């Protein structure tokens, strides 16, 4: 296996909170998959949840080397957790097509958060 891409992002949680306060659900609806949206609505700390998801999706867009454009959207990168809570990515629509085009075999996700920040790294392997 070879590393095809690596992306990291850090988000100041208060910035996400300010956007949510200003625009309501718009940001969450734009970046979350339908499944993530359900978790967001029920989460005890929805802004923190949203900030962490945003960081992962930004890191994924960087790892793919594309950013969010040319048919890619944040909600095409879905963060899912295994039984132990380990995060991974499920790809949809153009993101899934791009993964096939690039020969992606594995996606690795790590994420961390503290009081003020959420940080994520995504590694893509062939």
Curated annotation (Swiss-Prot):
It comes from the Bacteria. InterPro entries: 4-PPantetheinyl_Trfase_dom (IPR008278), 4-PPantetheinyl_Trfase_dom_sf (IPR037143), ACPS (IPR002582), Ppantetheine-prot_Trfase_dom (IPR004568). One of its GO terms (biological process) is fatty acid biosynthetic process. Transfers the 4'-phosphopantetheine moiety from coenzyme A to a Ser of acyl-carrier-protein. Signal peptide: none annotated. This is Holo-[acyl-carrier-protein] synthase. The gene is acpS. Keywords: Cytoplasm, Fatty acid biosynthesis, Fatty acid metabolism, Lipid biosynthesis, Lipid metabolism, Magnesium, Metal-binding, Transferase. It is found in: Cytoplasm. GO terms for cellular component: cytoplasm. GO terms for molecular function: holo-[acyl-carrier-protein] synthase activity; magnesium ion binding. Its cofactor is Mg(2+). The keyword Chaperone does not apply. Mg(2+) binds at residues 9, 58. Pfam families: ACPS (PF01648). It catalyses: apo-[ACP] + CoA = holo-[ACP] + adenosine 3',5'-bisphosphate + H(+). Belongs to the P-Pant transferase superfamily. AcpS family. Gene3D superfamilies: 4'-phosphopantetheinyl transferase domain (3.90.470.20). Its EC number is 2.7.8.7.
